[in-house]
Swiss-Prot record:
It is found in: Cytoplasm. The keyword NADP applies. It is an enzyme of class 1 (oxidoreductase). Pfam families: adh_short. Gene3D superfamilies: NAD(P)-binding Rossmann-like Domain. It comes from Schizosaccharomyces pombe (strain 972 / ATCC 24843). This is Uncharacterized oxidoreductase C162.03. SUPFAM superfamilies: NAD(P)-binding Rossmann-fold domains. NADP(+) binds at residues 17, 55, 82, 115, 148, 152, 184.
Length: 292
């Protein structure tokens, strides 16, 4: 089934990882729909390339993009939700507009694209692959990125729920990708800064870390793009894929910390059970979870 996947739609494709995904996709023979707010900045020209202007926060724009893609290539087999940006600042430093904008692009944009993709892939009878470019910040919360973290946590919760709703016979798979630092414009021109809050201007502030982060990133976007296409070709792609040593170590630490705190509070967690609670029901729950 996977060998019939021939068309990929990529959001946020004018630079960084998105641009690398366009180049690699064309090199591997895919029909590529490169979506961007500024498609004219995509300098690549190719007979298999369709450049589309897309605002992921606008439902009508998303619907139009999929219609145009289907009209040109007949279907969309792989969708890579890559559009997004980072908003830096302590939570109290954000204004309401900044907070809404971060969620609209990083979460609602992904939700709109995913909903449209699922409908098209299910009705095509071929299935498809959806790759959600999340972040290490979707599992490990980094200071001064609270709204960015929240947007990525939301993407992961949404995606994991959808995975459990899909009929395996539809051949639709979702992979959550959790990169660490990547050699792109994310930490430079693509990063937005909230106005500093005076209460947080002290030695504990993480602003200096983010101000100096660009240039320290580990992951090569071209290598990442190659890997993601390899993942999309698998019959059973992973549900989560961590990219980079930095992301791997931070996620391991968070996983360990969560597990340790969970076990240390077992007595508290179970102390609220009703008086006639049947412990055997826990085993039933475990069995049900294993079958999901």
């Amino acid at each position: 089934m996977k060998s019939t996947f021939s068309t990929v739609l990529i959001t946020g494709s004018s630079k960084g990882l998105g641009y690398a995904l366009v180049k690699v996709g064309l090199a591997q023979g895919y029909n590529v729909i490169a979506c961007s707010r500024a498609p004219d900045t995509i300098t690549i020209e190719h007979s298999k390339l369709l450049k589309l202007k897309l605002d992921v926060t606008d439902v009508k724009s998303v619907e139009t993009a999929f219609k145009d893609a289907k009209r040109r290539f007949g279907n969309v087999d792989i969708v890579i939700n890559n559009a997004g940006y980072g908003l830096v600042g302590e939570f109290e430093s954000y204004n309401i507009e900044e907070m809404h904008r971060q969620m609209n692009v990083n979460f609602w944009g992904v939700a709109y694209i995913t909903k449209e993709a699922l409908n098209l892939m299910r009705e095509s009878g071929k299935g498809g692959r959806i790759l959600q470019i999340s972040s290490v910040a979707g599992y490990y919360p980094s200071p001064c990125l609270s709204m960015y973290n929240a947007s990525k946590f939301a993407v992961e919760g949404l995606s994991q729920t959808i995975m459990r709703e899909l009929d395996p016979n539809w051949n639709i798979a979702i992979t959550i990708v959790q990169p660490g630092g990547m050699q792109t414009e994310w930490a430079s021109s693509n990063m937005q800064w909230a106005k500093p809050h005076p209460a947080y201007e002290n030695d504990r502030s993480w602003r200096p870390f983010w101000e100096n982060y660009h240039g320290c990133e580990e992951t090569d976007p071209n290598k990442a793009a190659e890997l993601l296409y390899s993942i999309a070709k698998l019959d059973r792609p992973p549900q989560k894929l961590v990219l980079g040593h930095d992301s791997l170590e931070l996620i391991r630490k968070q996983h360990q910390d969560i597990g340790e705190e969970l076990e240390s509070n077992v007595a508290l967690s179970t102390s609220v059970a009703k008086d006639d609670f049947d412990p055997a029901s826990v085993e039933t729950l475990r069995q049900n979870l294993q079958s999901m």
